[in-house]
């Protein structure tokens, strides 16, 4: 609300729409990775993260007073971000023997939470507090691009294939 001048009610609705948009987005991402990309998780993750990056840039560069575009950007980010998160866990399950699936799922969940959710809040909060939202959005954009590069590394990999 500091930068975009949202009131508390509008912020609540924006957050609600962001979260709920993730449900169909995650389902679509999984469907595309299975059907369109024939079990390859990399392309679906890459294209969804490309969309996230675009919506982050739109949200960042949109001046205050255009709440509809801010909300559209947040809905777009919410729709697109949870699919790649799901694909990371799915890739871990795809790439390990069945007897190690529980361990792989547990470790990706643990490290995803510790280094993703917790560290992201700490690091982004620190950056924004000390350097401002401009640098915060630079950080978010760079991280989104790095995520796209990570998905490129698995572009042609499927299930139990050998990983180079």
Task: Report each predicted region and the residues it spans.
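A membrane-interface helix-boundary motif in multi-pass transporters
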Residues: 40-43, 124-143
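Multi-pass alpha-helical transporter architecture, strongest
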Residues: 59-63, 89, 133, 138-164
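Short amphipathic helix-loop junctions that connect adjacent transmembrane helices
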Residues: 1-10, 128
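Intracellular juxtamembrane helix-capping segments at the cytosolic ends
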Residues: 82-97
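A late C-terminal transmembrane helix in Major Facilitator Superfamily
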Residues: 98-130
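Cytoplasmic membrane-interface "Motif A"-like loop-to-helix N-cap segments
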Residues: 35-49
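Helix-to-loop junctions at the C-terminal end of transmembrane segments
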Residues: 26-39, 128
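C-terminal ends and interior cores of transmembrane alpha-helices
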Residues: 50-64
